[in-house]
Amino acid sequence: MTNTVNYSTSNSTASAWTGMVPVDDTALYVTDTGGSGVPVVYLNGAYADHKHWRKVIAELGPGLRHICFDERARGKSKQSADYSFEACLRDIDAVLDARGVERAILVGWSYGGVLAWHWTDRNPDRVAGVVTVDSAPYGLTGPEGAERIRKLFHRMRFLLPLTRPFGMAARMSAAEHAEVNIELNEIADASGPVLERLRRPVRFVVATGNSLGSEDGEMEKARTSLEPVFANNPNVVLSAKVSSNHSKILSKDFPAIADAVREIAA
């Protein structure tokens, strides 16, 4: 069915474009390679900028139309009064509408993967498929989880500005970073039913080992939460489990991610 539907609002080739897309009280930095290929929209990790996708995009090549953007207060985008998950979902609307994209493949890493599930659940006719990179329906929840996350970001408060130029932190306070993460954990943990009802092809590429702030074995426990989803929804498939960790998966295992995108785009 995906091969019989136009991916954009026009049959003409889209022009390459870089600029700012206004939404709510802010503006998002967007890059669009243009072309006549299937649009692929990349959704970043919670505090990451679009540059982390460079190797994946280079591996896929110019046959696809690659659209990246920086979320609010990340990368080159402007700050906002609203950094909520719902605001991030609205940002996907704004970017696709601004670029005239009717239907796309969503590729999301970590936070971006959870965004992709929920946006697809709400907009199934606008999504050809989803590639999820090391996200899972699992999270640190409740008061204990929230307190642990707040303590982590409080300890990191002096490090965050130093990592920002490398696309690893946002122009937010440590407390704002923590609140983004607390909300993500609550939403991710409740997302199993969302994944189980998706009717678009969803491919997972998952990492191995731990990530920043996780306890030993915690990330592998999170990844096992996908097993019931794979069993209950044939549209959701494990494409690859790779050797790199959560932080390095885009830079080290980009070929596996590209293969999953090609499978959806075929």
Question: Each PLM stretch: what is its role?
Answer:
Residues 208-244, 253:
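Conserved loop-alpha-helix segment in the C-terminal half of the alpha/beta-hydrolase fold
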Residues 165-202, 206-215:
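Hydrophobic, aromatic-rich cap/lid helix
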Residues 70-74, 136, 244-245:
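Short beta-to-alpha linker loops that shape the active-site pocket of alpha/beta-hydrolase fold enzymes
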Residues 105, 128-131:
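Residue in the alpha/beta-hydrolase core beta-strand immediately N-terminal to the catalytic nucleophile
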Residues 26-78:
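Conserved HGGG/HGGXW glycine-rich cap/lid loop of the alpha/beta-hydrolase fold
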Residues 55-58, 67-107, 111:
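Active-site loop/oxyanion-hole signature of alpha/beta-hydrolase fold enzymes
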Residues 117, 121, 130-160:
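Flexible "cap/lid" loop of the alpha/beta hydrolase fold
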Residues 249-262:
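Post-His helix in hydrolase/transferase enzymes
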